[in-house]
C-alpha cells in the first residue's frame, strides 16, 4: 500500500544517512508485511475454469500432452488474460460480466490512480515528472528494436543518474520490474550483472495491454 511505501522509503533514507532531523523509528512488532502481486495466469485460469486448471496440472504431473480441444481452450483463456491482466478488481468484473470493456475501465482507473499517487512520495517536482514518464513509457521502450531502457526517451538531456531514483521508487512500489543484463552465462546466483543495461516491465500484463493502445473489444 502507499503507506507501506512511505515507511520503506523512510527506512532507506535513514540507512543512507539522509540527514533527517527526526529519527525514524520503525514500529517493530506492530506491522505484518505481506507482498501482494497481480494474479498470474495460473491463478486467473483457476478462477475462470477450475476444471481446465486441474486438467492441465494433472497432465503436467503425469507428463501427458493435453488434448487439442483443451489446449485451444487454454490458449483462448490465456489471450483473455493478456487483455484483462491480474489486478483482482479487473479480473472480478471480467469474470462476473464477461465484458472486456468494463474490465478495461477498472484498469484505466487503477492506472490513473497510480500516476496520481506518485506525487505523494517523490522528493521534487522533477522526480514526480520523471517517475510518471518512466511508468507511462514502458511499452514504448519495449516496442523499439532494442528493448533496453533508453534514458533519452524520458528526457533528451537526462543521464542514467537522473532516472535512478524514480526507477528505484517504482520498483520498490512493485509498479514495475527491472531486469539487468547478466555479464556472462549464469552458473551461480552471484553472477555479476551490468546495471547500466536493463529493461523495465510493468508488474501487470493488463496494464501493459492498456498502455499499448490495444482495443480489447477488437478481440471479442
Go through each PLM region and give its residues.
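Interdomain motor-coupling "hinge/lid" segment immediately C-terminal to the ATP-binding subdomain
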Residues: 2-3, 8-143
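Accessory nucleic acid-recognition modules appended to NTPase machines
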Residues: 92-220
Amino acid at each position: 500500500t502507499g503507506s507501506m511505501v512511505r515507511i520503506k522509503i523512510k527506512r532507506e533514507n535513514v540507512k543512507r544517512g539522509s540527514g533527517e532531523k527526526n529519527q525514524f523509528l520503525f514500529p517493530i512488532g506492530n506491522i505484518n508485511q505481506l507482498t501482494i502481486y497481480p494474479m498470474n495466469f495460473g491463478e486467473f485460469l483457476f478462477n475462470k475454469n477450475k476444471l481446465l486448471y486441474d486438467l492441465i496440472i494433472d497432465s503436467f504431473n503425469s507428463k501427458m500432452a493435453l488434448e487439442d480441444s483443451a489446449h485451444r481452450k487454454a490458449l483462448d483463456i490465456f489471450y483473455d488474460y493478456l487483455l484483462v491482466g491480474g489486478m483482482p478488481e479487473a479480473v472480478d468484473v471480467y469474470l462476473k460480466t464477461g465484458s472486456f470493456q468494463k474490465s478495461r475501465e477498472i484498469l484505466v482507473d487503477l492506472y490513473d490512480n497510480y500516476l496520481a499517487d506518485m506525487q505523494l512520495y517523490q522528493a521534487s517536482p522533477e522526480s514526480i515528472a520523471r517517475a510518471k514518464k518512466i511508468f507511462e513509457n514502458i511499452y514504448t521502450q519495449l516496442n523499439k528494436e532494442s528493448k533496453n531502457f533508453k534514458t533519452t526517451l524520458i528526457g533528451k538531456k537526462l543521464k542514467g543518474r537522473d532516472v535512478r531514483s524514480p526507477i528505484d521508487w517504482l520498483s520498490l512500489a512493485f509498479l514495475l520490474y527491472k531486469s539487468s543484463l547478466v555479464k556472462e552465462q549464469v552458473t551461480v546466483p552471484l553472477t555479476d550483472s551490468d546495471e547500466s543495461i536493463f529493461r523495465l516491465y510493468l508488474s501487470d500484463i493488463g496494464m501493459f495491454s492498456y498502455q499499448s493502445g490495444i482495443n480489447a473489444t477488437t478481440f471479442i
